[in-house]
Amino acid sequence: MVQHLSAQEIIQYISDAKKSTPLKVYVNGHFENVTFPESFKVFGSEHSKVIFCEADEWKQFYQKNHSLITELEIEMDRRNSAIPLKDLTNTNARIEPGAFIREQAIIEDGAVVMMGATINIGAIVGEGTMIDMNATLGGRATTGKNVHVGAGAVLAGVIEPPSASPVVIEDNVLIGANAVILEGVRVGAGAIVAAGAIVTQDVPAGAVVAGTPAKVIKQTSEVQDSKREIVSALRKLNNE
């Protein structure tokens, strides 16, 4: 598995990060003699602009030039944000629209992250692993290879308190929809976590657990192969 960032490293990263309030500004007006700051990204025609900038920089510009503006609309989706979304340009995985993956998360080759899934800072999605719709991997949560994390499932994050141990999901594990894996829990290779289970203790390799709190109900050898199959075709990319 890929090496974890420690809680202290993540805390330091967040603490040191320049907090950002980016704006997208749609503005009409008389800008013939206006010089825009170099930090602005400005698009459009002479009288109609789309501007990307920081909120404090826009405030200064607006105070100086508001008399030239005839129409204005501002989009802001965060305030004093410390962690940007991850640049996925070189990520060799299938990432669907609406997934939220923060910087310093690791997405390994052939993984799949579905719509609405959230991958927090320091989390690791292993090779060939699928994170289904609206599932959440909290800070430092780790999955191994060929894991399926079902829709709405939660792998608890552990950044605060920093002493807590992260969730670790070993290879070839199936986690059902809306299951919750609490901090510090390790789920052994090949195990199955039933839908809706709340897992408070380690799960042995090859076990099937269900309930609240989750308990071992049988072994995966007793489960039909078709009910625990990982489908490689769903992880296929264009370059394969």
Swiss-Prot record:
Enumerate the UniProt keywords alphabetically. Answer: Acyltransferase, Amino-acid biosynthesis, Diaminopimelate biosynthesis, Lysine biosynthesis, Repeat, Transferase
According to the UniProt entry, its GO molecular function terms are:
tetrahydrodipicolinate N-acetyltransferase activity
The record's listing under CDD domains reads: LbH_THP_succinylT
Cite a single GO BP annotation: diaminopimelate biosynthetic process
Q: Which Gene3D superfamilies does this UniProt record tie to the protein?
A: Hexapeptide repeat proteins, Malonyl-CoA ACP transacylase, ACP-binding
Q: In which pathway does it act?
A: Amino-acid biosynthesis; L-lysine biosynthesis via DAP pathway; LL-2,6-diaminopimelate from (S)-tetrahydrodipicolinate (acetylase route): step 1/3
Q: Which reaction does it catalyse?
A: (S)-2,3,4,5-tetrahydrodipicolinate + acetyl-CoA + H2O = L-2-acetamido-6-oxoheptanedioate + CoA
Q: What is its EC number?
A: 2.3.1.89
| InterPro entries membership | DapH (IPR019873), DapH_N (IPR013710), Hexapep (IPR001451), Hexapep_transf_CS (IPR018357), Trans_hexapeptide_repeat (IPR050179), Trimer_LpxA-like_sf (IPR011004)
Q: Which domain of life is it from?
A: Bacteria
Family stated for the protein in its record = Belongs to the transferase hexapeptide repeat family. DapH subfamily.
**What exactly does this protein do?**
Catalyzes the transfer of an acetyl group from acetyl-CoA to tetrahydrodipicolinate.
The protein here is known as 2,3,4,5-tetrahydropyridine-2,6-dicarboxylate N-acetyltransferase
> What is the species listed in this Swiss-Prot or TrEMBL entry?
Staphylococcus epidermidis (strain ATCC 35984 / DSM 28319 / BCRC 17069 / CCUG 31568 / BM 3577 / RP62A)
